[in-house]
Regions:
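Intrinsically disordered, low-complexity segments enriched in serine/proline and basic residues
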Residues: 542-565
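Glycine-rich N-terminal segment of FAD-binding domains in flavoprotein oxidoreductases
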Residues: 147
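C-terminal amphipathic alpha-helical interaction region
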Residues: 337-537
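Generic low-complexity, intrinsically disordered sequence content enriched
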Residues: 286, 534, 541-543
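Short regulatory "switch" loops immediately downstream of catalytic or recognition motifs
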Residues: 165, 442-443, 545
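Glycine-rich, acidic/polar active-site loops that bind/position phosphate-bearing ligands
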Residues: 1-143, 152-155, 162-399
Length: 565
């Protein structure tokens, strides 16, 4: 933050601001999370050990109807949210909004913006408080990036802007951004910073859980790009082609045609939720950060890479003899050299992946692929130049990240083996035995009666059981091999290339078996059980009936309750 402030003040001085002494990074983190019933949670060892479900077939109803997002908040969840807000405000955390998110049982909480370091600490407190308050309500708050397959995962949108201590927002384009040279210079520096350090920015959001979320047609892709919207994209195109922008697209007015309703002003910008780094009015929104992670890493990277771009711009312009000419030239140069990172289209599409490859943009689909960016020469030079990290500190962090990935994956693999061996396979064996017994009894009782259904189920179940057993054996061998690797980077790489595919191979047949095996036999709550509307214990009536015991009359208080599903 200090490095960013120093370089941003240099930019302000170039435009005649002699009053501002500091520029602060203002941050607001939108925290997403899932809420499940604690009673059901305790029956899922994968949720307890890893924070996510390692097995689970899709529920009949997911998020297809799009009826969860901003829908009515369920009463029990609403009481949890109200209690959470009270606890947060007691600590000075200004929680201001809460709503349902896209997936069933998914929600969001967001605070009022704070200075970056304060926002980071408050977000850590928020996550801890969420878990504590949820327990108080008989619930569990899941902060994992992908607790359930097949529906949206959870992220943490990191909204950030640059504000001087005199109250000026450096990212406010004004009504005519084409004439706002200070804003255009700041914008061009951000574009330059993100393009030059896209791999480092991707690394800042890398965590094992995000490997399950990013690029899954629900969250930002693993490819870093910037969305500017129609208005600013038009200004950038004019600058790239002509050196300056003569005008800009203006917002329109929406006339509903109803005399009793006012005419509505339309914003000149638009939204693109498929972009990982989007300009939204007067701020940028970095959407890659995982829901369980601290926002410190991403904001440290953003602050430093933007500070570097500001420093280079100030070095050039402070020597200028014709400031207006040179600032226009520098803005055009930055935008021309780094426009490849600008993209307003669908970030989920395969066409974008192909286009990004043609543009030379890095595509780092997993954590292990992203970690090396932390120790690249350009990264080390930048962090050391601004006194943020030394080379030794970056190498240490790199080792910790590799170790974290390897240990997390190993825990998930061992949990899968435990659940498969102790829960799923024994349950399926009991089911096949029941089918076989049914076939024998039907044939004995009535040879003419058909047993085709039982035989088909037995055959299909037996085949899937064999696949699961073989996959279990392969995963056991992979885990044993992993245990013999000493180098943490090699171990993490093996986990990505060997353990994770073996885990998928074990999950596939067991998820299919879940759709076949009798629910009474299935050993754990299903996705439908976990994500159904969180039950609410309703007190119906408390009464004191008289119970006769011979000549004596005893009074007892009886509470009748039921759980709404």
């Amino acid at each position: 933050m200090q490095a960013l402030s120093q370089q941003a003040v240099r930019i302000l001085r170039l435009f005649g601001d002699q009053e501002s002494q500091r520029v602060l990074l203002s941050v607001g983190a939108e925290q997403e999370y899932f809420i499940v019933d604690r009673e059901r949670y305790l029956k899922r060892r994968d949720l307890i050990y890893t924070g996510r479900t390692l097995f689970g077939a899709p529920a009949p109803k997911g998020q297809e109807l799009e009826d969860q997002y901003f829908g009515v908040i369920r009463e029990r969840v609403g009481e949890f949210m109200a209690d959470l807000n009270t606890e947060l405000w007691k600590m000075g955390i200004t929680a201001t909004t809460q709503h349902n998110e896209v997936a069933p049982a998914q929600h969001e909480s967001a605070p009022i913006y704070s200075t970056c370091n304060v926002a980071v600490d408050q977000n850590q407190l928020t996550m801890e408080t969420m878990k504590r308050v949820a327990t108080r309500h008989g619930l569990v708050c899941l902060l994992h990036e992908k607790p359930f397959a097949g529906v949206n995962g959870s992220g943490k949108h990191n909204n950030w802007s640059l504000n001087s201590d005199t109250g000026e927002n450096l990212l406010d384009p004004g009504t005519t951004p084409n004439d706002n040279l200070q804003f255009l210079l700041v914008l061009s520096c951000v574009i330059k910073a993100v393009d030059r350090h896209a791999d480092l920015l991707r690394m800042s959001a890398a965590c094992p859980g995000n490997d399950q979320r990013l690029g899954a047609d629900e969250a930002p892709p693993a490819i870093i790009s910037i969305f500017l919207g129609n208005q600013l994209s038009d200004v950038v195109n004019q600058i790239v082609e002509n050196g300056t922008a003569a005008g800009c697209i203006e917002g329109g007015r929406l006339d509903t045609g109803v005399s009793t309703l006012p005419v509505i002003d339309q914003d000149a910008t638009d939204r693109n939720r498929t972009s990982p780094f989007a300009f939204t009015g007067n701020k940028f929104e970095f959407r890659m950060v995982g829901s369980s992670e601290s926002i410190a890493n991403s904001n440290t990277v953003i602050s430093t890479i933007v500070a570097e771009a500001f420093c280079e711009a100030a070095d050039v312009l402070e020597k200028s003899e014709n400031f207006e000419r040179d600032v226009n030239l520098l803005i055009a140069e930055n935008m021309r050299n780094h426009r490849r990172v600008l993209f307003n289209g669908n970030g989920y599409s395969e066409e974008w992946r192909q286009e990004a490859a043609r543009r030379g943009l890095p595509n780092l689909p997993n954590m292990v692929s992203a970690i090396p960016a932390l120790t690249e020469e350009k990264t080390v030079e930048m962090f050391e130049k601004f006194g943020v990290f030394t080379k030794a500190e970056l190498e240490s962090r790199s080792e910790v990240l590799y170790e974290t990935y390897a240990k997390t994956t190993a825990i998930e693999a061992r949990t899968m083996l435990h659940m498969a061996g102790k829960h799923y396979i024994p349950a399926v064996v009991r089911y096949t035995a029941r089918l076989a017994d049914s076939i024998c009894k039907v044939r004995s009782a009535c040879p003419e009666a058909g047993t085709g259904v039982q035989e088909r189920l037995l055959k299909e179940t037996g085949e899937l059981l064999a696949q699961a057993s073989e996959a279990q054996k392969c995963l056991e061998e992979a885990v044993e091999k992993m245990n013999n690797i000493d180098n943490v980077r090699e171990m993490a790489t093996f986990c990505r290339d060997g353990i994770v595919p073996a885990m998928r191979a074990l999950r596939t047949p067991i998820d299919r078996l879940e759709l076949i095996v009798d629910k009474a036999i299935w050993p754990v709550p299903t996705y439908g059980d976990l994500r159904v509307e969180v039950g609410y214990l309703l007190l119906i009536k408390t009464f004191r009936p008289k119970i006769s015991e011979g000549k004596k009359v005893r009074k007892e208080t009886v509470t009748v309750s039921f759980r709404v599903q």
